[in-house]
Design a protein with these regions (language model features):
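N-terminal leader regions that mediate targeting or early regulatory function
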Residues: 1-93, 102, 110-113, 119-120, ...
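Post-transcriptional modification and biogenesis factors for structured RNAs
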Residues: 125
């Protein structure tokens, strides 16, 4: 929990994050907003490691992890968020040849999916990213 906002409730879509955005609001961001907004990714894809770049980002406790793993809605929304971000990556190629925040986002998403859902989904996500890289070269 960060600033009295439940990460589980946020992922289930019933509570906004500390910026007053619901998960649906983030999914509705334009590509320009996705590229230029840097504090949403930690909410869509929380991990048990503090962010070096967003001190207000949620850090999952063991109880948060269990609650998310036991929430069908949170897991469904995590999967949707992963596909949403894959679609963003597929629409662009500038992220492929440079090490930038999108590469860090990809690492975070992979870690989040592994931690909260399963290793296979994490690997499928990374495989899709690699397919985009190959196709866009």
């Amino acid at each position: 929990m960060t600033n009295n906002v439940s990460i589980v409730d946020f992922l289930e879509g019933v509570e906004p994050n500390i910026n007053k955005l619901y998960i649906q609001d983030i999914w509705d961001l334009s590509d320009e907003e996705i590229e230029n907004t840097h504090d949403f990714i930690q909410w869509l894809f929380p991990t048990d490691t503090p962010s070096r770049y967003n001190l207000a980002a949620p850090v999952l406790s063991e109880q948060d992890i269990l609650n998310i793993q036991n929430s069908k809605k949170a897991k469904k929304n995590l999967k949707y968020s992963a596909n949403w971000f894959l679609n963003f990556l597929d629409r662009h190629s500038y992220w492929i040849d440079k090490h930038d925040h999108n590469q860090l986002r990809i690492k975070r998403i992979k870690k989040c999916l592994r931690l909260l859902i399963d290793k296979n989904l994490s690997e499928k996500f990374l495989n899709r990213v690699n397919e985009f890289k190959e196709r866009k070269k």
